[in-house]
Amino acid sequence: MAVQVVQAVQAVHLESDAFLVCLNHALSTEKEEVMGLCIGELNDDTRSDSKFAYTGTEMRTVAEKVDAVRIVHIHSVIILRRSDKRKDRVEISPEQLSAASTEAERLAELTGRPMRVVGWYHSHPHITVWPSHVDVRTQAMYQMMDQGFVGLIFSCFIEDKNTKTGRVLYTCFQSIQAQKSSESLHGPRDFWSSSKHISIEGQKEEERYERIEIPIHIVPHVTIGKVCLESAVELPKILCQEEQDAYRRIHSLTHLDSVTKIHNGSVFTKNLCSQMSAVSGPLLQWLEDRLEQNQQHLRELQQEKEELMQELSSLE
């Protein structure tokens, strides 16, 4: 017997400027995972599709299904600063969540829309786009606080074996508690077992979670929003702060000799130069290109305005 899974979210709409910031962040480092938080709103889409004809009973059934559609709209993202840089692990501190909630409240006042933290994203450099058991368990923890919370993963630095070209894959997921029959229905690879145990009436029960993929759609934008632009500009600053923190933490050790300190300083300088070449330089060039494009568009609009004014004066 098939088990019906009730999804808290049916779709995610990610605006293209927020997608651009996530992509730039994921491609900023090849050795460690990066992370951030998504700011947006959760809407109940109650619109029905009038392109098809249904009978009365079918229409009621379709209307009930449509009324249940919940869509997460992601308008911007917040790039988080990593206190612990590890190859296969990212962590979000309560202080960062609190700061993100404060930023969401500021954006809500600025836009007049109910903005809040609706999800998180992180990168998978050189590995599969599918979430690990740690990702699924972390997502389940966030959903205990908010059922509409979603997780995004960007798999980057993946090379296609046939074409020898790089690829970037992305997915959106949520966690659900695995049914007892999940293993027999889908096989052991379709769910992830958590190592967390909870005590119920003196007995320990292992919680199992499985991922469920959420359809994600990129919403095109002609321009980049102010908030996303600020996040993109903030990326080099955050990467530089992470390098400074790591260098100061090592440099403060008292048992290091002079040669080791000189070596650490050289590594620190090399990392900063690499960031300038890989992140700051392309970002600056992109901003200059956008500025030139906007100025060209402004000149075209001014010329069009003058032509329309001339036509208007000739009619008088």
UniProtKB/Swiss-Prot annotation:
GO terms for biological process: cell division; chromatin remodeling; DNA repair-dependent chromatin remodeling; double-strand break repair; mitotic G2 DNA damage checkpoint signaling; positive regulation of DNA repair; positive regulation of NLRP3 inflammasome complex assembly; protein K63-linked deubiquitination. PROSITE patterns: MPN. It comes from Callithrix jacchus. Component of the ARISC complex, at least composed of UIMC1/RAP80, ABRAXAS1, BRCC3/BRCC36, BABAM2 and BABAM1/NBA1. Component of the BRCA1-A complex, at least composed of BRCA1, BARD1, UIMC1/RAP80, ABRAXAS1, BRCC3/BRCC36, BABAM2 and BABAM1/NBA1. In the BRCA1-A complex, interacts directly with ABRAXAS1 and BABAM2. Component of the BRISC complex, at least composed of ABRAXAS2, BRCC3/BRCC36, BABAM2 and BABAM1/NBA1. Identified in a complex with SHMT2 and the other subunits of the BRISC complex. In the BRISC complex, interacts directly with ABRAXAS2. Identified in a complex with ABRAXAS2 and NUMA1. Metalloprotease that specifically cleaves 'Lys-63'-linked polyubiquitin chains. Does not have activity toward 'Lys-48'-linked polyubiquitin chains. Component of the BRCA1-A complex, a complex that specifically recognizes 'Lys-63'-linked ubiquitinated histones H2A and H2AX at DNA lesions sites, leading to target the BRCA1-BARD1 heterodimer to sites of DNA damage at double-strand breaks (DSBs). In the BRCA1-A complex, it specifically removes 'Lys-63'-linked ubiquitin on histones H2A and H2AX, antagonizing the RNF8-dependent ubiquitination at double-strand breaks (DSBs). It is found in: Nucleus; Cytoplasm; Cytoplasm, Cytoskeleton, Spindle pole. A motif (JAMM motif) lies at residues 122-135. Belongs to the peptidase M67A family. BRCC36 subfamily. Residues 12-179 form the MPN domain. The lineage of its organism: Eukaryota, Metazoa, Chordata, Craniata, Vertebrata. InterPro entries: BRCC36_C, JAMM/MPN+_dom, JAMM_MPN+_peptidase_M67A, MPN, MPN_BRCC36. One of its GO terms (molecular function) is polyubiquitin modification-dependent protein binding. This is Lys-63-specific deubiquitinase BRCC36. Pfam families: BRCC36_C, JAB. Its cofactor is Zn(2+). Keywords: Acetylation, Cell cycle, Cell division, Chromatin regulator, Cytoplasm, Cytoskeleton, DNA damage, DNA repair, Hydrolase, Metal-binding, Metalloprotease, Mitosis, Nucleus, Phosphoprotein, Protease, Ubl conjugation pathway, Zinc. The modification N-acetylalanine is found at residue 2. The modification Phosphoserine is found at residue 258. The gene is BRCC3. It is an enzyme of class 3 (hydrolase). The keyword Nucleotide-binding does not apply. GO terms for cellular component: BRCA1-A complex; BRISC complex; cytoplasm; nucleus; spindle pole. Its EC number is 3.4.19.-. Zn(2+) binds at residues 122, 124, 135. Gene3D superfamilies: Cytidine Deaminase, domain 2. Binds 1 zinc ion per subunit.
